């Protein structure tokens, strides 16, 4: 993936995540531009470019699927959940006060 594609994905993800919140959207755009401008003179074959592009793609994915904004409507808040918002099944919450075992019966340290 090229840096230009990662830049565009990140800008679109910010627009989806912060739609309707012009102050936050503008700040996100400025931060994205600043981050890419700082690296604009780095050669394309530099070994630091691939991890930077991967990081930009991860941030874009996180913004699209995990950021939800709430707006105050009277005494309540309304969440702006969009089609890309990740929706969990909350299985662990449904268990109540039960103990959840992760990784089996291994003992830790000297216990």
From Swiss-Prot:
Transmembrane segments: none
Annotated GO MF terms: protein folding chaperone
Tagged with keyword Transit peptide: yes
Keywords, alphabetical: Chaperone, Mitochondrion, Transit peptide
Stored InterPro entries: Complex1_LYR_dom, Complex1_LYR_LYRM7, MZM1/LYRM7
Compartments reported by the entry: Mitochondrion matrix
Superkingdom, taxonomy of origin: Eukaryota
Pfam families recorded: Complex1_LYR
Example GO BP: mitochondrial respiratory chain complex III assembly
A single cellular component GO annotation: mitochondrial matrix
Function: Assembly factor required for Rieske Fe-S protein RIP1 incorporation into the cytochrome b-c1 (CIII) complex. Functions as a chaperone, binding to this subunit within the mitochondrial matrix and stabilizing it prior to its translocation and insertion into the late CIII dimeric intermediate within the mitochondrial inner membrane. Modulates the mitochondrial matrix zinc pool.
Family membership noted in the UniProt record: Belongs to the complex I LYR family. MZM1 subfamily.
Subunit structure: Interacts with RIP1.
Protein name per its UniProtKB record: Mitochondrial zinc maintenance protein 1, mitochondrial
Biological source species: Neurospora crassa (strain ATCC 24698 / 74-OR23-1A / CBS 708.71 / DSM 1257 / FGSC 987)
Lineage: Eukaryota, Fungi, Dikarya, Ascomycota, Pezizomycotina
């Amino acid at each position: 993936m090229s840096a230009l594609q990662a830049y565009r994905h990140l800008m679109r993800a910010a627009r989806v995540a912060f739609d309707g919140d012009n102050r936050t959207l503008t700040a996100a755009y400025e931060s994205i531009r600043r981050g890419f401008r700082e690296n604009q003179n780095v050669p394309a074959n530099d070994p630091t470019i691939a991890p930077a592009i991967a990081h930009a793609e991860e941030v874009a994915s996180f913004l699209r699927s995990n950021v939800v904004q709430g707006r105050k409507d009277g005494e309540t808040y309304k969440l702006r959940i969009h089609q890309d918002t990740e929706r969990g099944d909350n299985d662990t919450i449904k268990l109540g006060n039960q103990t959840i075992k992760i990784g089996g019966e291994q003992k830790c340290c000297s216990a």
